[in-house]
């Protein structure tokens, strides 16, 4: 059930199981990571109604975290991230919700910190999500990668915002999605560099492939730049599946379902290729290998 030796399991805000290293302190629903040995922690969250969860990474902390969440119909999960100076955190999110779920993330990064996030958005749920990360200290770096699948009649809407409040900060997002059947999938990528934050870089990619004519998909990039000496770019697009590719795979002996599964896997794989952390890479690959299985 747990991917690391150390773990904690919350059910509606109450701890039901735990095996924590000495560097991790839990108070109610706040998990504090203290400086010491590098930390690996698997957090499992079960939400029936609404829950708030707070991650605090103190200065100089090095941590790898996997969060697996099971959110029930109309469940809401609110999370905050506080990243101390010189902290280096790799964080992977696995959604396994059902029904309609709401996710709200807010993060703040201090100077010279690094936060790399992976979002595996492959659940059987309709989702409304807002993920906002603010770079508050010089040299802060946030890199967010998301793979999203919307199928059947699911409706999934993601707003991903990285805001630069300090100079020489880096914010990168790569969001890839697949929509099939009669599903809706909308990804809004937002990069904001406020006045005076020179030397900063904001880059984003938002791409969705559509399998079926009854799907609705939209990939929307927004850049709000109030400073001259910066780097900023965006790439966005919604495209249809290549029917010839599908026919070719079927001619090689695959069923249509197997061929579509392979195409889905291949389209979402670029999100893995841009990740430079082995744990996040492996979790993405494991999640994507189960798509359509």
At which residue positions do the language-model features occur?
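Glycine-centered structural positions embedded in regular secondary structure
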Residues: 5-8, 13, 146, 171, ...
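Conserved beta-strand/loop scaffold segments within soluble protein domains that form the structured core
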Residues: 23-247, 251-252, 275, 281-293
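Short arginine-rich
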Residues: 264-277
């Amino acid at each position: 059930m747990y991917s690391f030796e150390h773990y904690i399991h919350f059910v509606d805000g109450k701890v039901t199981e735990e095996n924590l290293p000495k560097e991790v302190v839990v108070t109610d629903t706040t998990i504090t990571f203290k400086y010491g040995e590098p930390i690996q922690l698997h957090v499992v969250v079960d939400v029936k109604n609404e829950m708030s969860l707070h991650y605090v990474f103190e200065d100089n902390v090095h941590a790898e975290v996997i969060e697996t969440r099971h959110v029930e119909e109309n469940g809401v999960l609110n999370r905050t991230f506080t990243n101390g100076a010189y902290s280096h955190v790799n964080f992977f999110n696995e959604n396994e919700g059902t029904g309609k779920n709401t996710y709200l993330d807010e993060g703040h990064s201090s100077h010279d910190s690094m936060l790399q996030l992976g979002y595996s958005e492959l659940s059987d749920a309709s989702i409304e999500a807002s993920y906002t990360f603010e770079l508050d200290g010089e040299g802060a770096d946030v890199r967010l990668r998301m793979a999203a699948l919307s199928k059947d009649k699911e409706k999934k809407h993601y707003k991903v915002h990285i805001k630069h409040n300090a100079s020489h900060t880096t914010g990168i997002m790569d969001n890839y999605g697949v929509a099939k059947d009669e599903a809706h999938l909308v990804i809004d990528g937002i990069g904001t560099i406020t006045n005076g934050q020179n030397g900063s870089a904001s880059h984003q990619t938002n791409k969705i492939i559509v399998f079926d004519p009854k799907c609705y998909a939209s990939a929307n990039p927004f850049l709000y730049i109030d400073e001259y000496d910066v780097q900023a770019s965006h790439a966005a697009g919604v495209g249809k599946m290549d029917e010839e590719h599908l026919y070719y795979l079927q001619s090689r002996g695959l069923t249509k379902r197997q061929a579509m599964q392979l195409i889905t896997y291949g389209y979402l794989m670029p999100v893995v290729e841009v990740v430079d952390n082995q744990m996040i890479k492996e979790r993405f690959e494991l999640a994507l290998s189960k798509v359509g299985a």
